[in-house]
């Protein structure tokens, strides 16, 4: 079979899921799950290598359309198909999923309780998350979205902390409850018009009445806003992070939150552009609320996990502002922020888990003075914190700068609105280094807790932990120094999406029409297209 016709995405999705089914058959000679760990890590690594090969050989950066397409009739009577593919919106997040999931397998090495079931869920989650980003059928997307909740719930409920049952139940109630909006909106879109179809491209090509679009958009926004999360739909996240283990942290922060951002791009902006034009100012304001509220709340937290969790919510606010900017630069910054936060969030939460394994406390008041005994941990914490506070030369700086400049140059909003939004968001940016640097001081240089510093478990980072952080820092710094590494993957798709969104904004459309009219009055200029706006 030729490279171009090989079913790459189906193979990449099904390999970890099928491999998970063989875990119960594996021997466990030492009773510690060593064989199962290595098996799962190798499966994850092989799947990621296949993903990189597919990307390198079959993905064309200059093509804005769907690539690596596979489509098989499943239930043709209702237009249901197994249809997968990748474009600029999904490919960066598919690569991110493979990368973070493989590292999470390695991060899970200390897990010894019910090892078989733990790695079974990890592998099933791996394939399921890629399916969410690759599927091109809205009903299958809903099934994948729902099935993804089951491994997360079990990973929280079985391997979480003292309040794991509460956190897992809250997670499932929030996410499963909000998913009803996806189901209702999906059925309404599919059965609207003469053709019954759940295909993304068919749904995007349909014309919907504006009132109907607004209802669909609101339903999707609630469902995806829970997963992003958007304040005030965020309260499940600090509780989930507060009880999760390190590998589950990495999957939550690195991948799960990006599912909400991706769906807003794909469904809300891509399929409902007229409704997006009306909701965009609300998205921008919600983004500002996310940035400010979560930054202030993080500043007040004394629990290390909850502090980083609120920091994550704050950073995801930039995704909303970029999505509502109506500029290619703003949309590009929003996409880059999702990739950047996936890497930075995974690194910070892994370090939180590694620190807890040594100190057995999450309270900053009980830490202090451990810098002398954990110098490598301090170096890793400091570097990752610098990435989170958007230090120049790291991915977060480029992403946030692109969002700010993209929004500032948008011609969809008046100057007073832009000044207010940028000023308020800038306050959140200023707060970030304050709470992160004070956190580092309290952990490593605060008043020494002799009971803690003299304990035998307080040892420096081991090679496995250094390797995981090094793997995460390479793309963080690489993107920060050369953003085109990532932006070239989705630029062509975002050019197409930006044009579609801008044509739906009355102010921009009127300006474009006026520009064309003015040009038509000049000899030799009538055939020329109006220059890009913003």
From Swiss-Prot:
Q: Which residues form a coiled coil?
A: none
EC number(s) recorded for this UniProt protein: 7.1.1.-
Principal location class: membrane
Task: Mention any one GO cellular component term assigned to this protein in its UniProt record.
Answer: plasma membrane-derived thylakoid membrane
- What are the TM regions of this chain, as residue ranges? 6-26, 38-58, 93-113, 117-137, 138-158, 171-191, 210-230, 245-265, 279-299, 313-333, 335-355, 377-399, 419-439
Pfam families from the xrefs? Proton_antipo_M (PF00361)
Domain of life, per UniProt, equals Bacteria
Which EC class heads this enzyme's classification?
A: translocase
Which keywords accompany this UniProt record? Membrane, NAD, NADP, Plastoquinone, Quinone, Thylakoid, Translocase, Transmembrane, Transmembrane helix
Q: What NCBIfam families does the annotation carry?
A: NDH_I_M, PRK02546.1, PRK12561.1
What is the name attached to this protein's record?
NAD(P)H-quinone oxidoreductase chain 4 2
